[in-house]
Design a protein with these regions (language model features):
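Short, charged, surface-exposed interaction patches
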Residues: 1-163
């Protein structure tokens, strides 16, 4: 029994059917309490914006939260730099995900812009079920590999056996 090995490549295209908005809020304040309360206020504003356009406040999910001390380098009178405490940085990373709808996306972005929370914003257009796309890609690659194997077998005067 002779064996040949072939590699298949696959191609799949999928139209985006899902939108993920990533929102980052960072507050820097001299005190921990002030940083936390200002961040909480900005989160409440974002939740209110989400509710105004038809979502529940729970739909705005926190993906990460951290508090760090910040320092800055300051030049003293002798020209030497030294680190000075700048405050506490409270950072929230949130996401809001929903089925693809460009009109709804425009409403959400407008509500966020109008709420005064001033988050950093990024928009990802993706597919809701990436496993289905991966499955289609594997099928395409397998069909490509089988076609290559059939061509090699025909050219060499052999029959394709079990796969």
């Amino acid at each position: 029994m002779r064996t040949i090995t072939v590699k298949g490549t696959g191609n799949v295209s999928a139209r985006p059917d899902y939108i993920i908005l990533s929102l980052n809020i960072e507050v820097l304040s001299e005190t921990y309490d002030r940083a936390m309360s200002e961040a909480a206020e900005r989160i409440e504003r974002l939740q209110g914006a989400a509710v105004r356009v038809g979502y529940r406040k729970e739909d705005l999910k926190t993906t990460s939260f951290d508090v760090q001390t910040r320092y800055e380098n300051v030049k003293d009178r002798q020209g030497n730099y030294k680190r000075e405490f700048a405050g506490y940085a409270c950072t929230y990373r949130l996401k809001l995900a929903f089925d693809f709808d460009s009109k709804q996306l425009a409403k959400v972005i407008s509500a966020i812009a109008d709420c005064g929370a001033q988050p950093e914003l990024s928009i990802a257009f993706t597919v809701k079920n990436p496993a289905r796309v991966s499955e289609e890609l594997l099928i395409s690659a397998t069909e490509n590999a089988k076609t290559k194997a059939e061509i090699l077998c025909k050219a060499s005067g052999n029959a394709l056996g079990q796969l």
